[in-house]
Amino acid sequence: MAPKKPEPKKEAAKPAPAPAPAPAPAPAPAPEAPKEPAFDPKSVKIDFTADQIEEFKEAFSLFDRTPTGEMKITYGQCGDVLRALGQNPTNAEVLRVLGKPKPEEMNVKMLDFETFLPILQHISRNKEQGTYEDFVEGLRVFDKESNGTVMGAELRHVLATLGEKMTEAEVEQLLAGQEDANGCINYEAFVKHIMSG
């Protein structure tokens, strides 16, 4: 018989080292705000009547400062024309529909009426625009005596420091002739004045 080979010694199984505690899960990244798709004027269906379009074209032409009357306005004038036509977009909304131009482009880039019309249609469909009642209600908060007026100085401060801040010159232009002898402003009349253009 063949001699038995000694069996190799089996090492005693060492206990596995205790697993390190799992690191705390990384905090989930903050969800990104959904990006609004870029505004595409070609995708806007125009619902205005021929008479309305003619009226809009006439108003648009009043803002045309090109030497030869090319029916073009600067990007910087777009919000003014929209407001002159009874719309009330925020500056941010105007910039969005213009493709978020750089500040230095606002008085250089031009917009023709055919490009402006879909912008006007889009803005006019926006239901988030403030109404007369919304603005009056917002100003009523500052009517400490419940007499239909707000202090002109307080309104100046609010317009220059909150929301879409206005420059001092813009505030003065807006409030020109609105204050009474006591420095108060009848806010219902003020809102009517602003919304009438």
From Swiss-Prot:
Residues 16-32 have a biased composition (Pro residues). The modification N,N,N-trimethylalanine is found at A2. Residues 51-88, 130-165 form the EF-hand domain. Residues 1-42 are annotated as: Disordered. CDD domains: EFh (cd00051). InterPro entries: CALM/Myosin/TropC-like, EF-hand-dom_pair, EF_hand_dom. GO terms for cellular component: A band; cytosol; myosin II complex. GO terms for molecular function: actin filament binding; actin monomer binding; calcium ion binding; myosin II heavy chain binding. GO terms for biological process: cardiac muscle contraction; positive regulation of ATP-dependent activity; regulation of the force of heart contraction. It comes from the Eukaryota. Residues 1-13, 33-42 have a biased composition (Basic and acidic residues). Gene3D superfamilies: EF-hand. Keywords: Atrial fibrillation, Disease variant, Methylation, Motor protein, Muscle protein, Myosin, Repeat. The keyword Repeat applies. It is linked to Atrial fibrillation, familial, 18: A familial form of atrial fibrillation, a common sustained cardiac rhythm disturbance. Atrial fibrillation is characterized by disorganized atrial electrical activity and ineffective atrial contraction promoting blood stasis in the atria and reduces ventricular filling. It can result in palpitations, syncope, thromboembolic stroke, and congestive heart failure. PANTHER family: MYOSIN LIGHT CHAIN 1, 3 (PTHR23048), MYOSIN LIGHT CHAIN 4 (PTHR23048:SF1). Myosin is a hexamer of 2 heavy chains and 4 light chains. Regulatory light chain of myosin. Does not bind calcium. This is Myosin light chain 4.
